[in-house]
């Protein structure tokens, strides 16, 4: 969504529509023929190339997420920019795309972290906002909530019953 030519962080966008409605246009499918709209997101954020990225991490945590998540370009091998999840941007994407169901992926990348952060708002010129601003050229300072990590290998789990309490708390927090 953030790379969409009309709704993304212009001018750091691609030349086409990447939102759900763009799929309808590209495929010649009427919007009323779509039932559910699945929003698929990572448990953390990434960005390729230039452009605003309020939650980008420039430290060993960002490097660790990049390494554990195998966040390198498939063609160039270039390292992707990594950061904590940005719930303000996620809510914006949900609204623009008309998402009816969410699917989180790559939560196992966060398995080893003692603490996990989630951006719930931004500070712009000292004022806290909880919506995605039209002009993001000015510095957006992320406002974080810290959550306990689950420090458990999620890749070995066979059912939801095995999920650690901290992981379930993270999911509940994201759902709210």
What role is predicted for each listed range?
Residues 1-176:
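Non-transmembrane, aqueous-exposed alpha-helical and coiled segments at domain scale
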């Amino acid at each position: 969504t953030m790379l969409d030519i009309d709704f993304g962080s212009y001018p750091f966008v691609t030349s086409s529509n990447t939102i759900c409605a763009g799929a309808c246009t590209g495929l010649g499918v009427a919007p009323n023929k779509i039932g559910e709209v699945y929003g698929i997101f990572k448990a953390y954020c990434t960005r390729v190339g230039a452009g605003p990225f309020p939650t980008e991490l420039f430290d060993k945590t960002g490097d660790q997420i990049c390494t554990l998540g195998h966040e390198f370009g498939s063609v160039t091998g270039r390292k992707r920019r990594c950061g904590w999840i940005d719930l303000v941007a996620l809510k914006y994407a949900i609204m623009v795309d008309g998402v009816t169901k969410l699917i989180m992926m790559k939560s196992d990348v966060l398995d080893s972290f003692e603490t996990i952060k989630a951006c719930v708002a931004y500070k712009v010129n000292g004022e806290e906002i909880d919506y995605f601003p039209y002009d993001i050229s000015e510095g957006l300072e992320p406002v974080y909530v810290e959550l306990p990590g689950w420090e458990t290998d999620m890749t070995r789990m066979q059912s939801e019953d095995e999920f650690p309490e901290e992981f379930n708390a993270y999911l509940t927090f994201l759902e709210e």
